[in-house]
């Protein structure tokens, strides 16, 4: 299912839709198991790299992907580490687009 999600395009949220909860959330989470669901509000994953440059290169690729998809994560960059957090700000919770973006980011690291 990760490949299927990674092939989809993020859809801009119109607002007024409820955030994902319960079974819907669990099913999507299974497609990106390396991501952690936090308080049914956001998903996060830490990536490690051998040095700062590789972490920075990864963050730049995530940034380009975010612009392409119109769905922008919070990104923490440190030496040898990048932490990505996703949620849909317009509804202050999770939508399918967050999981699509997570699957696309996973594809960047192989």
What residue spans do the PLM features occupy?
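Long, contiguous binding/interaction regions
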Residues: 1-33, 38-56, 60-110
């Amino acid at each position: 299912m990760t490949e299927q999600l990674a092939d989809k395009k993020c859809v801009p949220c119109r607002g007024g839709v409820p955030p994902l909860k319960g079974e819907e959330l669990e099913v999507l989470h299974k497609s990106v198991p390396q991501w952690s669901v936090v308080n049914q509000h956001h998903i996060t994953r830490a990536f490690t790299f051998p040095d700062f440059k590789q972490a920075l290169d990864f963050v730049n690729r995530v940034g380009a992907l975010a612009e392409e998809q119109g769905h922008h994560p919070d990104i923490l960059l440190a030496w040898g580490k990048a932490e990505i957090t996703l949620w849909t700000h317009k509804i202050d919770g999770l939508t399918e687009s967050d999981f699509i973006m997570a699957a696309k980011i996973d594809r960047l690291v192989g």
